[in-house]
């Protein structure tokens, strides 16, 4: 008989025969009847058994969180809180759990995050914890669907590379046979090469690695990056694509994951588009009107971003950043080369992502390399792609975990990562 998922039991007729597999969450043995709470990845159901000698012997031997099989029938006349249960006819232990458990699943014991991460497999069994990742999955799926609808194709680029994407030193070195190599910070260079190849619109979802020695609640050293690049586009086109992709992702999560939001005690609304825009220089004016000193060419501090973000209720763009704080591939503004056709997407004081129109003229690209004091020879495969017809193009890269953290109002990005990699953690 095929397995029945718990969340489909209401679709069955009263009295229908079912087989449920799952974790035995808790058991209550009464005089004549026993009640077991069984959990699978779709929900929890009560199963009731008459206490005949053979059945009672099995139930008494089941440790919490053991894997069990329950055969029985759907009972929609149940007086249980859910109004439905399984009237069990047999139960068997598929795989027994050891006792005691390294981390409680249902008991109201508050463990700190480090303890939870050390026993992550147990932590993820909690409904409110696994809900984060079901929402994250739906968020990503909504973004993917939107990009497909806009004629993007999904690509997969190398994660072992010979040079830094942005020329920095924040790289994890690896030994690639007899050569030195690095884990890629971003698919940026390869996305742009694909514009020269005529792919027109591409996106990638994959790991990115940053060897930055931070240890904050907003940073990871390995994260999931959603990157796009689009031809015959500028920074305004890229911003429109970004805000609509995020809106699509949130719409899908809200539509598909109502129970998960409820289990987290969260109610969210889909953001309206377009998101507000404010230029870098307008931000400076705003800060100075509040009596805050700021020098052109500096990046904004968290406190300064908090001041700026207080003017907005949600997502907003800061545009036209100085060339000095943007990567070499960022297009300068034609009317003021001090500035660039670039943007950061912010949520209050938190940076969500950044993007820009890219340089497409090979001579300007070489000039930008020289300004940033980068060795062109280290990027020859990339530079060559600009010599034979590179279209104007723009794009962005978006961290999935940070977006999820913002959406759910969580205080630590590690909560949105199955197995976080940070300054101190590489296990599990």
UniProtKB/Swiss-Prot annotation:
Gene3D superfamilies referenced in this protein's UniProt entry, alphabetically: Bira Bifunctional Protein, Domain 2 (3.30.930.10), Nucleic acid-binding proteins (2.40.50.140)
Superkingdom of this protein's organism: Archaea
UniProt entry tagged with the keyword Hydrolase: no
Residues crossing the lipid bilayer are none
Entry keyword set: Aminoacyl-tRNA synthetase, ATP-binding, Cytoplasm, Ligase, Magnesium, Metal-binding, Nucleotide-binding, Protein biosynthesis
Q: Which reaction does it catalyse?
A: tRNA(Asp) + L-aspartate + ATP = L-aspartyl-tRNA(Asp) + AMP + diphosphate
Predominant location of this chain? cytoplasm
Pfam families, from UniProt? tRNA-synt_2, tRNA_anti-codon
Detail which positions bind Mg(2+) 2.
Answer: 351, 354
Region Aspartate, annotated ranges: 188-191
What is the recorded function of this protein according to its Swiss-Prot or TrEMBL entry?
Catalyzes the attachment of L-aspartate to tRNA(Asp) in a two-step reaction: L-aspartate is first activated by ATP to form Asp-AMP and then transferred to the acceptor end of tRNA(Asp).
This protein is called what? Aspartate--tRNA(Asp) ligase
Q: Which organism is it from?
A: Thermoplasma acidophilum (strain ATCC 25905 / DSM 1728 / JCM 9062 / NBRC 15155 / AMRC-C165)
